[in-house]
Amino acid sequence: MKFEDLFKKKTAPVTDTADVTGETPDECPNSDTDTKQKEKSLDQVAPKSIGVLDMVIAFDTTGSMAAYIGAVRQEVSELIPRLFEDNEDLRLGIVAFGDYCDMKNPQEFGKAYQCIMPTDNQDELVKFVKRSKDTSGGDSDEFYELVIKKIVEETPWREDANRVILLISDATPHPVGYTFKKYVVNNQIDWREEARKAAQMKIKIDTVTITDEPWYKELSQMTDGMSVPFESGAKTARLVEAATWSRGSKADRLKFDRLMEECSDKEMQEVFTAYMSERMKCDDDDC
């Protein structure tokens, strides 16, 4: 795809495969019976094949949002192995992004869009997070519309995978028609159109409600993703664990349940509850 084509309105139909360009509960389980009952329940909700997970975590690195990926950098060497230890079918991608003003020039993103495609190469993921650069952002909006478009269209999603984007951000997308110097002129990327493409490709987009901007909940609703109450940058690694394990292998989901039962942090309780609600919905719908 040519660079300038990213900002043009696309009318081609979307297919299922993207082109590749580049407080604690009252009682915790303490017996074999509890464990067997939980495993039986998970067999209904999480058959072995559902552990196939392609997940892209997209970090806004502008201004104060840099603290979120910064918190992950501090423990990434331990975090990444934990995410993979019980799921050989996990592929994880990471995007660190800024805004148009952070681009190297009108034809090169530079540090404005840094990414590693979904992979199970843990060393490369750790290296990417440690080497990713923070950005400044030039106005109240950020180029979320472009980030969504690029991740949806350029990620080599596996056909049988559960496809998820976790967007960790706090601002709003640029509107259609936005211009910034020569970097983008009369931008034709509409985030709602990109969300519809994601939904057609069965890509869920999870968002975090760091602010009360309504577009986050709308984005998640449009793509059948989760809008998760979350504010504290220092807990970002815990958020990533919850988002990954809630849709991972049976072992991952048991780990998620155990952490939820043991959790006493109010904010993380809300995160766990949000992801558990998806599990319950899936159970009710027999999906």
Predicted region positions:
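Divalent cation-coordinating acidic motifs and surrounding scaffolds
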Residues: K2-C287
